[in-house]
Amino acid sequence: MNSRRRFVKQMGRGMAAAAAYPILSPLQSCNGRSRTATQVETTTTSELFFKISLAEWSLNRALFGGQLDHLDFPQYAKENFGIDAVEYVNQFFMDKARDKAYLGELKARCDDHDITNVLIMCDREGDLGDTVPLQRRAAVENHYKWVEAAQFLGCHAIRVNAAGEGTAEEVAQCAAESLTELATFASDYNISVIVENHGGYSSNGKWLSGVMQMVALPNCGTLPDLGNFCMKRSDPLEQTTEAYMATECLEEYDRYLGTAELLPFAKGISAKTYDFDADGNETSIDYGRILRMVNETGFTGYVGIEYEGHSLTANEGITKTKTMLERIGSGLT
């Protein structure tokens, strides 16, 4: 299947949604180095109840466009934003998962600059909720190399997607079985497998929390993305990432309800931002409300900045997001 067809298939899965998302019984079965002049000080966040990391996707345009190299991302994050923890996206080093020389160079750069590797976001490795057994097995095994890479880099987790085609019940059961298998494998590496609400069924908090209840393993959890509760989108005008990002949400799950449903299983938070008002607040997400919810659960892990707006440059958006999180978070400790 060529890349164009793969894109259409992947995007289509992210647009599917169903009218009902029941929680299934576990008994059901699935068939089928030196500082630069521009370097900023790393902000001390000890007064916050959470830690701040930077998701590599925030800089996707620079990375895809060749203005920024994946190996330079960690140092770039620290020198430009004062962020010393990073979240990788496998798309930017897709063929390097088992390249120990490459991974060793990446790890050495992080060690040299006191940067923490938090997780690897994994895409394009098949559908963990696939209802076809052989394809589902391939998807599970395709993620093994990222578990190994995550351990090598010192990450605590890999982020995966619970996608699949079929009814809500079928995809949930198959995703649960895949996650059980993958998390069992990952436990030998001290790696967690965390699922993001990432379109389709997974953007329904009740559905995804139900999958978590079915898996019920300590190293399997969620990565609530505060902006990813769209269950159905309009069709992209062309088959590019930019065109998909410009699509309109046609059906959206309540983000505050969804966040509440996913937080009990959270092993990370993805702080999605798009635009800001004159007071520096995100215009579409009430971060004061969200962070109070997060704080009430006792969460103390990483909140990863993921800027996806277009009105600001990526650097401006990242900086505004960090400032907002620190301002709101400091008032909740």
Give, region by region, the residue ranges found by the protein language model.
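Catalytic domains of carbohydrate-active enzymes, especially glycoside hydrolases
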Residues: 69-89, 154
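Hydrophobic faces of well-ordered beta-strands that scaffold small-molecule active sites
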Residues: 50-56, 84-88, 117-122, 158-160, ...
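Active-site acidic/histidine proton-transfer and metal-coordination neighborhood
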Residues: 11-24, 37-47, 75, 109-224, ...
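Acidic/histidine-rich catalytic cores of soluble enzymes
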Residues: 85-86, 176-292
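Boundary/entry segment of secreted carbohydrate-active catalytic domains
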Residues: 45-69
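Glycine-rich, proline-tolerant flexible connector loops at the mouths of alpha/beta enzymes
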Residues: 87-107, 165-166
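N-terminal twin-arginine translocation
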Residues: 1-6, 18-37
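Charged helix-capping and loop-helix junction motifs
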Residues: 68-72, 100-105, 136, 140-143, ...
